[in-house]
Amino acid sequence: ISKRVIEWFRTKPSVISGLRDNDFSRYTKEILHTRTDYKDEILDFISSMDVGFREVTTEQEYIDEKMLPKGLPAEIVASLKEHPPIVAYAKHSKINADGEVVGIVDFDIEERESDGTRKLFNLAGPIVDTLRQGKSLFVDELDAQLHPLLSRRIVKLFNYAETNPHGAQLIFTTHDTNMLSKKLLRRDQVVFVEKTAKTSYSTKLTPMMSITLDNGAKPRTDSNYGKNYLEGKYGAIPYFEDEFKDCNE
């Protein structure tokens, strides 16, 4: 059994840091550049997130060895020549003073788009691939740099059979209490994480379904999960020695 578990984790999941998702920029660019069967799905995902563009083109850069820094290790030079960088361009409409479309302008996504748009682009490849293959995707800090409604939309893609026919799984961490909604997540999908003590580096995981409230009951399905969490009913919140008054007091 242990060998099967290890093999599953080795072959199935992808792991992404929501704060350092640039590592997956190349992944998305390469799929767009080489996999025509993925391109439409990735562009549909990007377009559905209301980022302001629908089309993306890619271009593989030419590596001139003479332009590389002197003394660069030979293995790095060889890697750059074998896998030259790919640049992705978002096609934006050019609008005149009368609000009319008068042309198209290309934006280098890495250079000219916002942090949130770049993150969505970087996540697009792994998300589409995960949904197509029925794999598991781990994203740390999913909500970082994203509007709350965009984070929720990504979660919904995994919640419905229409968009997730192969049973792919999204496992993510977040500090956004907007995610704690009965309209988005069931109780058995939520786990709270907290340090066991101020001086301890260990972490305690508490599934919402295992929590017992002060009245001896379990969290109700019609509860306001986010409000109850911030009120400390589920634990896993910071505690302060002093407290500031609310602005309306």
Predicted regions and their residues:
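Short, contiguous acidic/charged loop-to-helix segments that flank catalytic cores in large enzymes
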Residues: 109-112, 145, 161, 180
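C-terminal lobe/lid and adjacent interdomain/linker elements of RecA-like ASCE P-loop ATPase modules
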Residues: 153-249
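Catalytic core segments in nucleotide and nucleic-acid processing enzymes
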Residues: 116-117, 148, 154
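Short basic/glycine-enriched coil/helix segment immediately N-terminal to the Walker B
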Residues: 127-135
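Conserved D-loop-proximal element of ABC-family nucleotide-binding domains
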Residues: 132, 144-148
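Contiguous, well-ordered alpha-helical segments that form the cores/surfaces of helical PPI scaffolds
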Residues: 121-128, 156-157
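Walker B catalytic acidic pair
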Residues: 140-142
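Phosphate-coordinating catalytic segments in nucleotide- and nucleic-acid-processing enzymes
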Residues: 1-124, 225-228, 239-249
